[in-house]
């Protein structure tokens, strides 16, 4: 154990003598601590120095046991449920290594952390979350030997510092690096898919690859805490958000904003913290769909093309995801989802006229053969053994071209047989897929080279009066149609090579091509959900 004499008059020689003794003792003790810091558990961090205990007041003695006891007191008093708090508690409950002490007392790396904590309000986050004032006060007590009794006793101060520095370090670096709100938790528990007395399942609305602080990251963070000041400072710098949009948004926190505008800004800043590992700006060619804007942006180097789109309705929201456009299908057939069969088609079971008028046919999934619509019941239509398909060509709901990309929702971008939707202000009209207003232009964009011959084939395939016959047998009209089609020009599928990255995102505040931030309506209500989870982290008044 080591001793610290109670504070005397500032000019007292006795005080100066005891301060020197304490510093020498603390240097010796913490040198021993530093040598053992490579171990995750230490049984004797502070040496017992009974031979000099007579120079000390009992209330000013600190030992490893009393330090651990003080840390344990902090653990038991901490009821926070965020990830950083639980990681901190787990570390010390398991006897984890002391991280912030050096041969000189408290490491200078604590000052590096405090420097970041003092600036968190500039990025809209509350300093109270990181105990900045308490840490600064305790650092001053340690460096001036201004200890007292009770909560400010030497052991309580050191225990509190150790615990709060660790918790603040984890909370800051994880919050900035990964976001303070987990989007998968808040966005994937909104729309109920199915509910019964046993459990409730939800529709997945957010499927963007998003990193979270896992075991490897936590181990790295604790390793850095036990390292030197330069390593801590570097780790703090590298924890800043990687999304280029983050810095753009943060700059506007000092603008005079209404309460609603400030909340919108803070919510989008939080979105920009989420670490997706990949961003549109990483690519020279990409497609960006920002759902609230109800527009598509296609970028190829310096070339930019925008177009209106239709998105999923409130009941069938377009999911958020990243992928790559890999193929274009011309005059595609539409395999109609069971959800649409249930709501729009099943009550027409048995009506051949209805199926013929919509260019629908029914297929037996087991045999692969078409089935006469007049022989099919509503229950058969809803079973897994039968499917309803719309023939490709003029009048198909998917239009004349579909843009395919891998995802977990069977969604895609496509043309439409109802272009009037693009003149509407509210274009939340689909079952989740994305309708594009200029499908031919988007198809040309997907080409790696502007091949005139290929462009002509695409134009021909998308404009020829292609109407597959829905009647049994071949009448004169269908025969004439077949003869009029130039099969050499008709395209079926065309691979996109190289594949084009596509980002389906959700920002209600996003810069235009001139860098001006443009607000968009919160079409799916995600802002409120995110803000309600975020507001506990925000600086006063925000």
How would you describe each model-predicted region?
Residues 1-48:
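Bacterial Sec-dependent N-terminal signal peptides
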Residues 191-203:
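Eukaryote-specific, cytoplasm-facing alpha-helical/coiled-coil scaffolding segments in long proteins
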Residues 34, 175-182, 334, 452:
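Intrinsically disordered or highly flexible coil/loop and linker segments, enriched in small
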Residues 180, 189-190, 205-210, 214:
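A sensor for short, sequence-defined functional sites
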Residues 39-194:
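Cationic-aromatic interfacial patches
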Residues 2, 38-86, 170, 190, ...:
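Well-ordered beta-sheet/strand-loop patches within structured domains
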């Amino acid at each position: 154990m080591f001793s610290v004499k109670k504070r005397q008059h500032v000019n007292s020689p006795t005080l100066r003598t005891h301060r020197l003794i304490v510093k020498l003792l603390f240097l010796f003790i913490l040198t021993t601590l530093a040598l053992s810091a490579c171990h995750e558990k230490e049984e004797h961090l502070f040496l017992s120095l009974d031979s000099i205990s007579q120079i000390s007041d009992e209330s000013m003695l600190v030992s490893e046991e009393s330090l651990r006891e003080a840390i344990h007191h902090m653990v038991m008093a901490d009821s926070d449920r965020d990830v950083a708090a639980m990681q901190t508690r787990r570390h010390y409950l398991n006897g984890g290594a002391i991280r912030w002490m050096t041969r000189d007392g408290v490491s200078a790396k604590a000052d590096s952390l405090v420097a970041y904590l003092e600036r968190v309000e500039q990025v809209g986050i509350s300093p109270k979350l990181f105990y900045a004032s308490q840490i600064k006060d305790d650092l001053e007590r340690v460096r001036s030997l201004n200890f007292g009794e009770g909560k400010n006793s030497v052991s309580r101060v050191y225990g509190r510092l150790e615990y709060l520095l660790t918790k603040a370090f984890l909370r800051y670096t994880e919050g900035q690096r990964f976001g303070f709100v987990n989007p998968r938790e808040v966005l994937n528990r909104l729309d109920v898919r199915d509910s019964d007395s046993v459990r409730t399942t939800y529709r997945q609305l957010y499927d963007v690859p998003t990193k979270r602080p896992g075991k490897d990251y936590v181990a790295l963070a604790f390793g850095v805490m036990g390292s030197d000041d330069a390593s801590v400072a570097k780790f703090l710098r590298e924890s800043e958000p990687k999304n280029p949009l983050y810095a753009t948004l943060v700059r506007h926190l000092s603008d005079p904003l209404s309460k609603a505008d400030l909340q919108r800004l803070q919510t989008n800043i939080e979105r920009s913290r989420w670490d997706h590992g990949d961003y549109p700006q990483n690519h020279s060619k990409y497609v960006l769909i920002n759902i609230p804007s109800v527009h598509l942006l296609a970028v190829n180097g310096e070339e930019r093309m925008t177009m209106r789109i239709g998105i999923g309705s409130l009941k069938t929201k377009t999911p958020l995801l990243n992928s790559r456009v890999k193929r274009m299908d011309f005059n595609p057939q539409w395999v109609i989802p069971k959800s649409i069969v249930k709501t729009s088609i099943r009550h027409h079971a048995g009506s051949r006229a209805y199926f013929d008028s919509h260019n629908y046919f029914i297929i037996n999934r087991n045999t692969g053969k078409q089935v006469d619509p007049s022989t099919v019941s509503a229950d058969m239509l809803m079973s897994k053994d039968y499917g309803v398909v719309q023939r490709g060509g003029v009048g198909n709901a998917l239009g004349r071209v579909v843009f395919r990309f891998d995802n977990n929702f069977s969604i895609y971008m496509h043309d439409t047989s109802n272009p009037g939707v693009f003149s509407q202000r509210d274009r939340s009209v689909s079952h989740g897929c994305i309708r594009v207003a200029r499908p031919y232009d988007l198809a040309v964009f997907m080409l790696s080279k502007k091949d005139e011959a290929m462009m002509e084939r695409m134009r021909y395939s998308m404009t020829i009066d292609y109407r597959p016959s829905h009647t049994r047998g071949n009448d004169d009209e269908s025969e004439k149609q077949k003869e009029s089609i130039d099969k050499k020009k008709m395209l079926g599928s065309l691979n996109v090579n190289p594949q084009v990255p596509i980002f389906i995102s959700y920002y209600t505040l996003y810069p235009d091509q001139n860098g001006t931030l443009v607000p968009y309506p919160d079409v799916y209500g995600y802002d409120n959900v995110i803000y309600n989870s975020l507001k506990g982290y925000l600086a006063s008044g925000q």
